[in-house]
């Protein structure tokens, strides 16, 4: 192919083209070596400085069978970094300066007067302030650097050493060990912060008395009603005897603001949350109907609006009934994992599926009755009615 091109274009033209191509490649490689490391726009690879480019004079005879040439290996070594010269004005002063020289420098003691007279005439120390940073004297430029120092600062290899040594080259084992130790400490602290933030995000409702956190408001309401209600009522009775009124708690959830009766049950609302009727009339059926009230939040509803059966209506009068938003497990007493709650079709109590004995993996199809209703109703429980 090269012979055909040389025959068509001529020998001299071909030699000139090859020389220009060689010069172009040499300039390109030299320019790339100056700005190493760089990101290759074609391969998207960060090219770092290396020694794979060899000259013809570096060739040696092959040492293995079938090997034409060998090139000398070069051991990697870390380059020395050239630091810019320090400004003498940035150096620290001596530990024991002469007090008289410092006073002369600040202008308190004139050079031709006595020290005692100058101290008597001078202003108090509080009135002596530092010179304004905007003065022309404080903005004097740094002294010009020498040619060799400027060359050392502007040398591109010095700036490339940082990237070569730390990002693209192997580091010494000693330095690598220090880096791992630092990273481990920072990572563990960061993991603790992330775990705390994740816990706050998963359980946004916190008790303002003990600080315990819950995933939803019903759990917080149940915790407050069963853990702090008795203590709060006892403290309120003692505070009535004192002359000073108790300090009100400003930031309290809505469920905690509901008024409680003497037995700890929330005062019931006199209207239905579904049809907005009262005990005298149900606006859906236009008939009078007794209201069922939640013992935690006081919300009320008609049995027909709640789709209660006659058995369920009789059962809710025997215990502290809770609405769907305040419902908690009858075994563990918490409202966490409310998606795992299973409700009895005879008494409307709630149970976690994993709290049952034996645990239930999936909710059963049809009606389900708890162990209390099975012992009380026997074969009249809803679970047997559904099977029949």
From Swiss-Prot:
Would the keyword Metal-binding be found if you checked this record's keyword annotation? Answer: yes
Enumerate the Gene3D superfamilies for this protein: Zinc/RING finger domain, C3HC4 (zinc finger) (3.30.40.10)
Source organism, top-level taxon: Eukaryota
- This protein's GO CC annotations: cytoplasm; nBAF complex
Which residues form each disulfide bond in the chain?
A: none
| BP GO terms, sorted | apoptotic process; nervous system development
Give one Pfam family, short name only: PHD
Compositionally biased region (Basic and acidic residues)? 97-107, 123-137, 251-262
Q: Where is the composition biased (Acidic residues)?
A: 156-170
In residue numbers, the region (Disordered) covers 60-190, 233-264
**ZnF bounds (C2H2-type):** 205-228
Q: What protein family is recorded?
A: Belongs to the requiem/DPF family.
Protein name, as recorded: Zinc finger protein ubi-d4 A
Organism of derivation: Xenopus laevis
Cite the source lineage. Answer: Eukaryota, Metazoa, Chordata, Craniata, Vertebrata
């Amino acid at each position: 192919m090269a012979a055909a091109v040389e025959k068509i274009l001529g020998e001299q033209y071909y030699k000139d083209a090859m020389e220009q191509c060689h010069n172009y490649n040499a300039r390109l490689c030299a320019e790339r070596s100056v700005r190493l490391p760089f990101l290759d726009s074609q391969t998207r690879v960060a090219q770092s400085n290396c020694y794979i480019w060899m000259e013809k004079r570096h060739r040696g005879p092959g040492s293995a069978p079938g090997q034409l040439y060998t090139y000398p290996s070069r051991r990697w070594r870390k380059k020395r970094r050239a630091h810019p010269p320090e400004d003498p004005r940035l150096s620290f002063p001596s530990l024991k300066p002469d007090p008289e020289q410092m006073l002369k420098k600040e202008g308190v003691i004139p050079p031709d007067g006595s020290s005692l007279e100058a101290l008597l005439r001078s202003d108090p120390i509080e009135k002596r302030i530092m010179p304004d940073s905007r003065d022309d004297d404080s903005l004097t430029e740094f002294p010009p650097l020498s040619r060799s120092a400027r060359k050392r600062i502007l040398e591109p290899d010095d700036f490339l050493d940082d990237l070569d040594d730390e990002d693209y080259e192997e580091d010494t084992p000693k330095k690598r060990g220090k880096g791992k130790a630092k990273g481990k400490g920072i990572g563990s602290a960061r993991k603790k912060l992330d775990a705390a933030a994740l816990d706050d995000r998963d359980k946004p409702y916190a008790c303002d008395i003990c600080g315990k956190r819950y995933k939803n408001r019903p759990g917080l309401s149940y915790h407050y009603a069963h853990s702090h209600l008795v203590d709060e009522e006892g403290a309120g009775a003692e505070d009535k005897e004192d002359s000073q009124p108790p300090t009100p708690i400003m930031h309290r959830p809505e469920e905690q603001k509901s008024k409680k009766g003497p037995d700890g049950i929330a005062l019931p609302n006199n209207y239905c949350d579904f049809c907005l009727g009262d005990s005298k009339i149900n606006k859906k059926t236009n008939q009078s109907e007794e209201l069922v009230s939640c013992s935690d939040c006081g919300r009320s509803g008609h049995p027909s609006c709640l789709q209660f059966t006659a058995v369920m209506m009789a059962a809710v009068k025997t215990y502290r009934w809770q609405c769907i938003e305040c419902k908690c497990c009858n075994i563990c007493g918490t409202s966490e994992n409310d998606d795992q709650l299973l409700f009895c079709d005879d008494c409307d109590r709630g149970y976690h599926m994993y709290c049952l004995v034996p645990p239930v993996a999936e909710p059963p199809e049809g009606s389900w009755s708890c162990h209390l209703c099975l012992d009380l109703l026997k074969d009249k429980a809803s679970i047997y009615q559904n099977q029949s």
